[in-house]
């Protein structure tokens, strides 16, 4: 039991250090594949052999489950039916998250039904958001009212005051305001994206499954894929000479190795220690 407590304390320290690194981590998350994913899990980048400042080849992660009978969030263990204090959750879409230990431990959260999900486009209206809200908080309707709003030019697109957007090459979500100046380091209108990986995919992490991404691996994963009876590892060539390895289920892979998934998804050991997958969108073989 003491060893479990020690590992939990060490993991919490890792999370504290990651938080102290602040903007440097955030910049890396927006520019480097898998960095945001690993940052959220409290992992740290391993130094490159050439000591360059290029994107990390691999990360070192704390033990995500020192005790497999507990849920873990940001290094803190939660027993069955324990709830994460809302002030500790950095994702406004994750509310009232409680640990459930039935089989493998996992978190269950309250379902949030945003009106924009059920009522998509509003004619002559702009949906407005607040930085710490999950759903839209209001509407601005009518030509004159909309014309009076400030605008933000971001990545070739125009956003109206109150609209949310995610700038390219960043791991941030922002709200268009009159103070927007093209930078994302102002906490008044931008915050780091938190994918809620430990909250929504607790059991997948425990089983050493692989995150699945669409578009690029600098955004949040859309899910995980896990080993199955038909999983096959195709050995590749480690052209970068990375010594770190990936773990997929109970299998160990070298950088360059690939894992068979399905016709729409390709998985590989690229940035250890997790295998990562890319899903085609759209998939030509989907029905």
Predicted regions and their residues:
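Extracellular secretome segments
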Residues: 2-287
């Amino acid at each position: 039991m003491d060893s479990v407590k020690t590992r939990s304390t060490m993991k919490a320290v890792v999370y504290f250090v990651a938080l102290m690194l602040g903007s440097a981590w955030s910049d890396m998350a927006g520019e480097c594949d898998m960095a945001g994913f690993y940052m959220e899990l409290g992992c740290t980048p391993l130094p490159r052999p050439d000591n360059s400042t290029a994107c990390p080849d691999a990360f070192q992660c704390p033990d995500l489950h020192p005790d497999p009978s507990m849920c873990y969030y940001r290094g803190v263990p939660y027993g069955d039916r324990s709830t994460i204090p809302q002030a500790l959750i950095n994702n406004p879409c994750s509310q009232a998250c409680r640990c459930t230990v039935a089989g493998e431990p996992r978190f269950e959260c309250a379902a949030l039904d945003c009106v924009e999900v059920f009522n998509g486009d509003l004619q002559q209206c702009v949906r407005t958001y607040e930085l710490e809200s999950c759903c839209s908080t209001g509407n601005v309707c009518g030509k004159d009212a909309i014309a009076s709003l400030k605008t933000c030019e971001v990545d070739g697109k125009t956003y109206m005051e109150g609209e949310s957007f995610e700038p390219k090459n960043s791991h941030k979500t922002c709200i268009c305001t009159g103070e927007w100046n093209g930078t994302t380091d102002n906490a008044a209108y931008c915050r780091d994206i938190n994918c809620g990986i430990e909250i929504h995919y607790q059991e997948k992490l425990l089983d050493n499954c692989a995150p699945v991404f669409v578009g690029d691996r600098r955004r949040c994963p859309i899910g995980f894929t896990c080993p199955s009876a038909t999983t096959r590892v195709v050995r590749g060539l480690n052209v970068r000479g990375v010594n770190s390895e990936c773990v997929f289920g109970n299998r160990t892979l070298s950088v360059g190795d690939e894992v068979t998934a399905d016709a729409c998804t390709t998985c590989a050991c690229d940035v250890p220690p997790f295998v990562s997958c890319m899903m085609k969108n759209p998939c030509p073989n989907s029905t």
